[in-house]
Every structure is written in structure tokens, then in C-alpha cells.
């Protein structure tokens, strides 16, 4: 077996002890709650038989070929989730997950040497609930013996370009918790498995490492990168996935699979394949065993040349394979027997059923020194002119709906945690966060939020989100009634983005409650559609505050034309309630008059400004021409406008067309939507706006609120016209004279920042075939350029593709509509309905000094992702209980969190348990002006108002292992030795967060009983 690997904590394969109460704290009674004890029992490492200990024996001195039987089951793509599970619409795609799992389990039970891996808990959990107790017991035994192994373990195999890190963590937690609850430590995945996502982010690897994974296997990487890795024997190495976290916290061993995730040529034995079976009867005229064995031996020898050890893998399966598992296993049984029989003739090839975990174990035991990777795997191309950078922006409406749903889910989770059981059963009925949790998890799938599914499947994704919002709205209503001591008919305006809200538009009086999911106070301008008139707005202390009614541009809404504006201040993790009343005609002059946009005369200089910022517009073109930071005395010429790339349908150089996945413009220079904009101006005491109309399908409002340190650009694009038979990919572009040396910066899943360079890859010499598409990168929350003194940052409200194709330039793709499929399997052009979609979104623009930039964009991006939730009511309802005094303002925290600290997760985990994640949201050395990149310490024990923490247990990021007992394999690298410190004992009164560190806790709590005021 060779020398065993080094491990931290318990030895691989488990020990004989359960969880010790290490890295935890007893804050109250010495008796642990039953739910907590049950959780400890499930996660006891002493029970971990399924892991490295159950791996099959290999043969030293031979080339060991690990066959990895697997299926790749998309959670929606050409068919919906339900259609895939049940096997509906076989004429679209022959695929049925329920039959796959039935068949695999049956085949595994036939022979003890057979093995299989499974990934998607969205499917497996559904199948599991439909099984008999006998079948469940049989599956538990298979898992315990390592014959059925779970890899990844998330609800889905998530996308890595269009996903926010918080949503990734949530979906992984959901899937891994199902495995923990169902199989205990036997079901603990040790390996991450992303074989189909179209490029890989550095933050994804960091998150996996923090979840306790030992390794990460990839299917798709750039074709040039792969060739280079094969030549340099770098198909496997250590990914150091953070510049801030001290190694090995974000280190993850990463391997590139030899054949994406498909079986080798001629060795596909699924009902969906056409390769002949193994015929081992020499009397048969179809006898092919000898030929297949010789082919296999040559294939194994050739593949070994690209890897460093005497172990290699072959993925035996593909999309929705194993519906008839017997076909696969019967032929692999023969292959294994026939190939291994050649050892008596001198063959040095040993083939075996295996799993990614067992393969990783052998690599670790080899005790080699591995190279280190520090960048990411974007952008991905599978051939010349074939860059998968279009999906960064595909289906922007779905991308925004997903981001809004993440926002609302955190609100729902937090209120459920703050209030406890009364949020689930209250005056408005039964509330539940689970449906939205599951819908959001499904949306992280690499064909969901990516925008790469068929239109009917996209519609179904939206349906799932909408269905999840309902139970959460009930829960939020119950919780707000409990916290405010008042029962009201709450209304959730889901269509505020298109200026529709029936309560505010039809009511003479109403109340506006804003819940703030951040751990710090937030000031925000509220905008609500109203019918023409003037209004009095009162704050939570019943004092009149400033408000304005402004006209909405006619190209925004055909029905309602006015919006009410007022400034709101909402405490940390709490709410504020404002009352609104329409004034009678007699009182109009006592309040601000309505503000209508005024046509701008070209000979006047056009400026909008407040005490912090000024934006100047070209009076001839109507375009933005300069931004000034008055606070820091910075001025930058900035021209912003909308352009579109003419989408390729294929040409003489390549047949590749632009599509849902691929971005390929016909030419490198985009076409302006218009070289000028028709403009009008709104100026009130609260806001100054320039309304720009570029065309019938493209408009924008550039606004500056009172006291705001950033410029807001609210764009409306679509339906994109295609009657000219030209597909169009629309960008918003900012041009400046900044000298940026061909460099720009993008975020990785909303967290750490990566430097990008045009026409450059850090680990190989790039042959650039697409100078536009090949320089596009995913932008989840921000992109910026800098000259070393000033920094221009643009924040997004959804994931988009972005780049800087010329010095001082920055562009983001906001919408795309295409007429041709890109030949990647969807077989449907990205038309988005017959007429196309109209999409509205926001870009927030910051101009600041480099030293101050991080403090600005970190906090603003956090507020953009987790904005206050607006809830309306008519007021005047009954008290929550007798003698209750209504509350119009509330905070769930005893004190605000420091600006460095983000409350990433606060959610119910059990009847008396909560899940808590605290995050340091600044990178190392990122902020010097305010010292925000320094470690910060806080008291968790006395942090919350509504409950008392009795016990606190620190866990890995996905909350499925105690941190003190988490065991990860150790690896030697060419960068030198790495220290492996033991987790320190937890003191809940003094929890320290280092830059970019996330700490995860499970807490046993007691909610306060409500007392009549």
C-alpha cells in the first residue's frame, strides 16, 4: 500500500471517538438539548466507515486504472426538473432519474466489487423519500461500505460564473445536510466534483476547501490550458484559492479529468450509446474481447503519460446514463476481468472499480510535491473562436430574479431565526422557508442561473422561485406581526422593479415597513409608485420627513407615471415603519409640489450634484461626460453610452455562432445604439435625475440622491429588435482617459478580487482567436479600473459579463438576443419569447481614491445584494396580543456589527437550534485608510436581542462537520512547507475574524417569551 498520507485531526477512515466538546462553549445549563445531541451523533467521526478506509486495494508497481461509474443528471436543461426525474418527454431527451437510481442500486447489490458515485441531492432526496424501508436500509449499507459514494453533495452542481458565494454556500449546505441527516458520517463527501460547469472560479475552490473537502475534480477547462497541462504534467496540482486566507485554509488539491466526464471512445455501454458490448466468447463471430483489451491497454498507457503517478482515472458515464445500469456493469465486469488476466502475460496494468475519493487517496499516498495554482479557470474555450462567455449575461431577467430571491430568502431566514416557532405558525397561517431554500438551490444549477436552459425550463425555474416566495411571505408577515406587536394586512410588491404596487397606487393611506438584513444601519431612498398627488410621510417617531413625488419616464410604464420618494433609516437586523398619507388638494402648497421631467435646452450646461458628487453631461449629445468626487477633489472625464455587438452566425473562419453559451461578435467594434440621447431633467430636494432616451428600446435614468456618494444608472433595455436578422448583444460602456496598462479587476462570486489582463493568461501563452469574447470575464457584483491614484468602480445588481478592451475603458453586457443556436446542445436560439424581454437594471458608479475604494465598494456591494425588504400595509389593524404597544422600529442586535463584519447567515437549523455565519468582508491589505483589513473581534454570546445562546459549536463552512474534528489531507507543494494549526478553543465572548475569513456556528438557543408591554 505504500506510505500513508499525513492527516490532521483524526486519521483518515475515522477513529473510535465521537465528537469531543471541543471548539464549543457551554453558556448555560449543562444539559444539551436532544436535537443537539442527535446532530452530534450523526456527525461522529468514529462512525465514518465510508471514506478512505473502504477503498479497494491497488497494486504497487503497476498502472492502476480507476474506473469511475457515474451519471451526470442536470437539474433542468432541455427538460424541467420534474420531467427529468419522472422521464417525461422522451422525444426531447431520453432521461429519467428515478429509473437511473432504481437500476444502479439493483446492480450494486448484485456484486460487492461494483461502485458508483452520485452528485445531485435535488434528485436523490426526492427518490429517497419514495423508497421502502427495506430499500433504504439496503442503500444505507451500500453507502456504509463505500460502494455507493456521494461526491460534491450539494443540492445541485452549481454554476461558477453567475453565482453569488452566499447562494453557493446555501445550496451546498442544503444538500450536505440531507446527507448528514440521512446517512450520518457515512454519507460525508470528501471530494468536490464539478465536471460540467463552463469554467471554474477561484472562490468556488476556496469555499470547497473551507467546507472540508480534500480534493476537487474538473471536467471542462480551456483547450489551450489543457494541452499545456498535459505537456507539463500539471493536470493535477494544488489550488491556492485565496490571497487573504492563510494556507492551507483555502488550499484544495485539484485534478483535471482526462476526457471531460465522458467514457473513453469505444467504451460507452449505456442505452444511449452505440458502442458494441464486450463479446468474450471466442466462438462467436462477434468476438471482440482481445481487440478491446489491447485497445484498453494502449489507452491506459497513453493516458498515464499526462499524469505523475501510477494511478489514472476513466470516467464511465455521462449525461443521464445508467437507466439500464446492468448494461454498464456487465460490460465493465468483463473488461476488468479480461484486462487483469493479462497480468500473467506480463501486463503491468491493473483496472478496478473505484471512486474519486479512492483515487485521491492514492495520489495523496504517493507523497509527491505538487505545483500551485493561484488564478482561476476563466474564460473557458473548447476550441478556437469558441469562448463560453456569453452565458455570463444570458437571460438577465432570470439572473435578477435569482438575486432578488437570494435577498428575500435571507430576510425570511433571519426573521425565522429571530422570532422562532411563532414565525412558522402565526396569525397569517403557516410560514415556511424551505420551499424558497430549495428553489434557490435549484437555481444555482449550472444550466439555471447561467441562462443556458431552454425557454420552457427557464419558465419553470421562475415558477419554482415564485412558489417559494409565498410561504416566505407568510413567515415574514408572522414575524413582523410578532416583533411589531401589531397584526396588519401585509402586502409584498413583487413588481416594484417595473413600478407596480397596488397598495401604494390605490390607497390614500398606507404604511411602509422596511426590514434591513444587514448587521449595520442602512439609509435608503424609498421609491414607490403612486397615483398623481402629494403625500405626507412620517418616520417611526411620528415626525414629518421630506418627500417628493416625481414623474416616471413614459418609456418605463404605460400605466402609472409617478413615484413617491422619501429617505428611510433602518436599524441593523431590524425594521422601521413609515406612514404615508395623501394630501387633500387644499394642502398642496403646504408640501413639495410634484416634479416633472423638463426638456433640456442644448445651450445650458447640464449638471446634477450633491455635497459629495457631481455629474456633468454633454449638452449636445446628452451623454455623461464627467464625474467628480467633491469630497476627495477628484475629477474624471467619463463618457457612458450603450452599444451592441452584431452576433456571429458563423463565417469562413469558423462556423461557431453566438448563442446561450458562446459569445462571438462579428467584428470587434460595437455599434452605438445611438450617438446621442434625448434628455430631460428632474431636480428636487431629494434627488436629481437625467432621463436619457437612446431609442425605442434603450433608455436610462442617471440619478444622484441627497447624501449619496455614488451615481446610480438605471437602464432599461429591450425588447431588442431583430427584424433586421441581426442578433444583438448590448453593452453599457464607460470610456475614460485613465492609463490602466491593459488591466482591470473583477470579483470572484462576489468576494475576493482578481486582476485581469487583456489577451493574457497567467499560466500559459495564449493564442487569442477572439479579442472581444476572449477577454470577457464574469462580474458578479463589481468591476473596476484604476491608474494607481483613482479608481472607477461599477457595481452590478446581477451577474453579467464584463471587460476592459482598451485602456481606460470598461464595459458590461446587459442584455442579448440571438437568432442562431451555438451548437452546445440546447438546440434553441436565445430569443426569450417571440417579442423578446424588456429588462431593467442598475449600475452603481463610484469614483474614489485607490486607498478609499475598497471601503466604498465593499459596503455598497453588500447593501446592493442584501437590500432592505419593503412590506406595505394599510394600517389600523388589531394588536398582536392584549395590552401590546405597537413598535415602529426594532433591531435584532444589541449593537451594530463592525463595518468589516458581515452577517452571512442567520437561519433556523432545528427546533431550538440556529445556524450562524459571520464573515470578514475585506481582503488582506485592501483598506489602509480605515484599518478595515485588520482582524476584528466581537462578542457573539450577547449579540442578539430575541434569543439567548446556550451552546455554541463551531463547524466547517457547510455546517456538516465540527471544526475541531474536521480532517483534511495534507499535501506537499513546491512553494515550501505549510503549517497546520489546531483550531483554538472557542470563546463566544471573543470571536476573532481575519480578513476574508468566514466562521460558522451551530447554536442552541432559547427564544424570549413575549411579554405584554
From Swiss-Prot:
Disulfide bonds join 55-358, 268-273, 412-472, 493-501. The keyword Membrane does not apply. Its EC number is 3.2.1.24. Residues 1-49 form the signal peptide. GO terms for molecular function: alpha-mannosidase activity; D-mannose binding; metal ion binding. One of its GO terms (cellular component) is extracellular space. It is found in: Lysosome. GO terms for biological process: learning or memory; mannose metabolic process; oligosaccharide catabolic process; protein modification process. It comes from the Eukaryota. Keywords: Disulfide bond, Glycoprotein, Glycosidase, Hydrolase, Lysosome, Metal-binding, Signal, Zinc. It catalyses: Hydrolysis of terminal, non-reducing alpha-D-mannose residues in alpha-D-mannosides. InterPro entries: Gal_mutarotase_sf_dom, GH38_C, Glyco_hydro/deAcase_b/a-brl, Glyco_hydro_38_C, Glyco_hydro_38_cen, Glyco_hydro_38_cen_sf, Glyco_hydro_38_N, Glyco_hydro_38_N_sf. The keyword Hydrolase applies. Its cofactor is Zn(2+). Glycans are attached at residues 310, 345, 367, 489, 497, 544, 633, 646, 693, 767, 931. SUPFAM superfamilies: Families 57/38 glycoside transferase middle domain, Galactose mutarotase-like, Glycoside hydrolase/deacetylase. It is an enzyme of class 3 (hydrolase). Binds 1 zinc ion per subunit. Belongs to the glycosyl hydrolase 38 family. This is Lysosomal alpha-mannosidase. It comes from Mus musculus.
Amino acid at each position: 500500500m505504500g506510505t500513508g498520507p499525513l492527516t490532521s485531526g483524526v486519521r483518515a477512515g475515522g477513529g473510535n471517538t465521537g465528537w469531543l466538546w471541543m471548539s464549543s462553549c457551554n453558556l448555560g445549563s449543562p444539559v444539551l438539548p436532544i436535537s443537539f445531541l442527535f446532530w452530534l451523533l450523526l456527525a461522529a467521526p468514529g462512525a465514518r466507515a465510508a471514506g478512505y478506509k473502504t477503498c479497494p486495494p491497488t497494486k504497487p508497481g503497476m498502472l492502476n486504472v480507476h474506473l469511475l461509474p457515474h451519471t451526470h443528471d442536470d437539474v433542468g436543461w432541455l427538460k424541467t426538473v420534474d420531467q427529468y426525474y419522472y422521464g417525461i418527454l422522451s422525444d426531447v431527451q431520453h432521461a429519467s432519474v428515478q429509473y437511473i437510481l432504481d437500476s444502479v442500486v439493483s446492480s450494486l447489490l448484485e456484486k460487492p466489487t461494483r461502485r458508483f458515485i452520485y452528485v445531485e441531492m435535488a434528485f436523490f432526496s426526492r427518490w429517497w423519500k419514495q423508497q421502502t424501508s427495506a430499500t433504504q436500509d439496503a442503500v444505507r449499507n451500500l453507502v456504509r461500505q463505500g460502494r455507493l459514494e456521494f461526491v460534491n453533495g450539494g443540492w445541485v452542481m452549481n454554476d461558477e460564473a453567475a453565482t453569488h458565494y452566499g447562494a453557493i454556500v446555501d445550496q451546498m449546505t442544503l444538500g450536505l445536510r440531507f446527507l448528514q441527516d440521512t446517512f450520518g458520517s457515512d454519507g460525508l463527501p470528501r471530494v468536490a466534483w464539478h465536471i460540467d460547469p463552463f469554467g471554474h472560479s477561484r472562490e468556488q475552490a476556496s469555499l470547497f476547501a473551507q467546507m472540508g473537502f480534500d480534493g476537487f475534480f474538473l471536467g471542462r477547462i480551456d483547450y489551450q490550458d489543457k494541452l499545456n497541462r498535459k505537456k507539463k504534467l500539471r493536470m493535477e496540482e494544488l489550488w491556492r484559492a485565496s490571497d487573504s486566507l492563510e494556507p492551507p485554509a483555502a488550499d484544495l488539491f485539484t485534478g483535471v479529468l482526462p476526457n471531460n466526464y465522458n467514457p473513453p471512445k469505444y467504451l460507452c455501454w449505456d442505452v444511449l450509446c452505440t458502442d458494441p458490448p464486450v463479446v468474450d466468447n471466442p466462438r462467436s463471430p462477434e468476438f471482440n474481447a482481445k481487440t478491446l483489451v489491447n485497445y484498453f491497454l494502449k489507452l491506459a498507457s497513453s493516458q498515464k503519460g499526462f499524469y505523475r503517478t501510477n494511478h489514472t482515472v476513466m470516467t464511465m458515464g455521462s449525461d443521464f446514463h445508467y437507466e439500464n445500469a446492468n448494461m454498464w456493469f456487465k460490460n465493465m465486469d468483463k473488461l476488468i476481468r479480461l484486462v487483469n488476466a493479462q497480468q500473467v502475460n506480463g501486463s503491468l496494468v491493473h483496472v478496478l472499480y473505484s471512486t474519486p475519493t479512492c483515487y485521491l487517496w492514492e495520489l495523496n499516498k504517493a507523497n509527491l510535491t505538487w505545483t500551485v495554482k493561484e488564478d482561476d479557470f476563466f474564460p473557458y474555450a473548447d476550441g478556437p473562436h469558441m469562448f463560453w462567455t456569453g452565458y455570463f449575461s444570458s437571460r438577465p431577467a432570470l439572473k435578477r430574479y435569482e438575486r432578488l430571491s437570494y435577498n428575500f430568502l435571507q430576510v425570511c431566514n433571519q426573521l425565522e431565526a429571530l422570532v422562532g416557532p411563532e414565525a412558522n405558525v402565526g396569525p397569517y397561517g403557516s410560514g415556511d422557508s424551505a420551499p424558497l431554500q430549495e428553489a434557490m438551490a435549484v437555481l444555482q444549477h449550472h444550466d439555471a442561473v447561467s441562462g443556458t436552459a431552454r425557454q420552457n425550463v427557464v419558465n419553470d425555474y421562475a415558477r419554482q422561485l415564485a412558489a417559494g416566495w409565498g410561504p416566505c411571505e407568510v413567515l415574514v408577515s408572522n414575524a413582523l406581526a410578532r416583533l411589531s406587536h401589531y397584526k396588519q394586512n401585509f402586502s409584498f410588491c413583487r413588481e416594484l422593479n417595473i413600478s407596480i404596487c397596488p397598495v401604494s397606487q390605490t390607497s390614500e393611506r398606507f404604511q411602509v415597513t422596511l426590514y434591513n438584513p444587514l448587521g449595520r444601519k442602512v439609509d435608503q431612498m424609498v421609491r414607490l409608485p403612486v397615483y398623481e398627488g402629494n403625500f405626507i410621510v412620517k418616520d417611526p417617531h411620528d415626525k414629518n420627513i421630506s418627500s417628493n413625488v416625481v414623474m416616471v419616464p413614459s418609456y418605463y410604464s404605460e400605466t402609472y407615471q409617478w413615484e413617491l420618494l422619501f429617505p428611510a433609516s433602518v436599524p441593523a437586523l431590524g425594521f422601521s415603519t413609515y406612514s404615508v398619507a395623501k394630501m387633500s388638494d387644499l394642502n398642496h402648497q403646504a408640501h413639495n409640489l410634484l416634479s416633472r421631467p423638463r426638456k433640456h435646452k442644448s445651450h445650458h450646461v447640464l449638471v446634477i450634484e450633491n455635497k459629495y458628487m457631481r455629474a456633468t453631461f454633454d449638452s449636445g449629445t446628452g451623454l455623461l461626460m464627467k464625474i467628480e468626487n467633491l469630497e476627495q477633489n477628484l475629477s474624471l472625464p467619463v463618457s457612458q453610452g450603450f452599444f451592441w455587438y452584431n452576433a456571429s452566425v458563423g463565417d469562413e473562419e469558423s462556423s461557431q455562432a453566438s448563442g446561450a453559451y458562446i459569445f462571438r461578435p462579428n467584428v470587434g467594434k460595437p455599434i452605438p445604439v445611438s450617438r446621442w440621447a434625448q434628455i430631460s431633467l428632474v431636480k428636487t430636494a431629494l434627488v436629481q435625475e437625467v432621463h436619457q432616451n437612446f431609442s425605442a428600446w434603450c433608455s436610462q435614468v442617471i440619478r444622484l440622491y441627497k447624501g449619496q456618494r455614488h451615481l446610480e444608472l438605471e437602464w432599461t433595455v429591450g425588447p431588442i429588435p431583430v427584424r433586421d436578422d441581426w442578433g444583438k448583444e448590448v453593452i453599457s460602456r464607460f470610456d475614460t482617459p485613465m492609463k490602466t496598462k491593459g488591466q482591470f479587476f473583477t470579483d470572484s462570486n462576489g468576494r475576493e478580487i482578481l486582476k485581469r489582463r487583456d489577451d493574457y493568461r497567467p499560466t500559459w501563452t495564449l493564442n487569442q482567436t477572439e479579442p472581444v469574447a476572449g477577454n470577457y470575464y464574469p462580474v458578479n457584483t463589481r468591476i473596476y479600473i484604476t491608474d494607481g491614484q483613482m479608481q472607477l468602480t461599477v457595481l452590478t445588481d446581477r451577474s453579467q459579463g464584463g471587460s476592459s478592451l482598451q485602456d481606460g475603458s470598461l464595459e458590461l453586457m446587459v442584455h442579448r438576443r440571438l437568432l442562431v443556436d451555438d451548437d452546445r446542445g440546447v438546440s434553441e436560439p436565445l430569443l426569450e419569447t417571440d417579442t423578446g424581454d424588456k429588462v431593467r437594471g442598475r449600475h452603481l458608479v463610484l469614483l474614489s481614491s485607490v486607498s478609499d475604494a475598497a471601503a466604498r465598494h465593499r459596503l455598497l456591494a453588500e447593501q446592493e445584494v442584501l437590500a432592505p425588504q419593503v412590506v406595505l400595509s394599510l394600517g389600523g389593524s388589531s394588536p398582536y396580543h392584549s395590552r401590546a404597544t405597537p413598535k415602529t422600529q426594532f433591531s435584532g442586535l444589541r449593537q451594530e456589527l463592525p463595518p468589516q463584519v458581515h452577517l452571512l447567515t442567520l437561519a433556523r437549523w432545528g427546533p431550538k437550534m440556529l445556524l450562524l455565519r459571520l464573515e470578514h468582508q475585506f481582503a488582506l491589505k485592501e483598506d489602509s485608510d480605515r484599518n478595515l483589513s485588520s482582524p476584528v473581534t466581537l462578542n457573539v454570546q450577547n449579540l442578539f436581542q430575541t434569543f439567548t445562546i446556550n451552546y455554541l459549536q463551531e463547524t466547517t463552512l457547510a455546517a456538516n462537520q465540527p471544526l475541531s474534528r474536521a480532517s483534511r489531507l495534507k499535501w506537499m507543494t513546491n512553494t515550501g512547507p505549510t503549517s497546520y494549526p489546531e483550531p483554538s478553543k472557542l470563546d463566544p465572548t471573543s470571536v476573532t475574524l481575519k480578513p476574508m475569513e468566514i466562521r460558522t456556528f451551530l447554536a442552541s438557543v432559547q427564544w424570549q417569551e413575549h411579554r405584554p408591554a
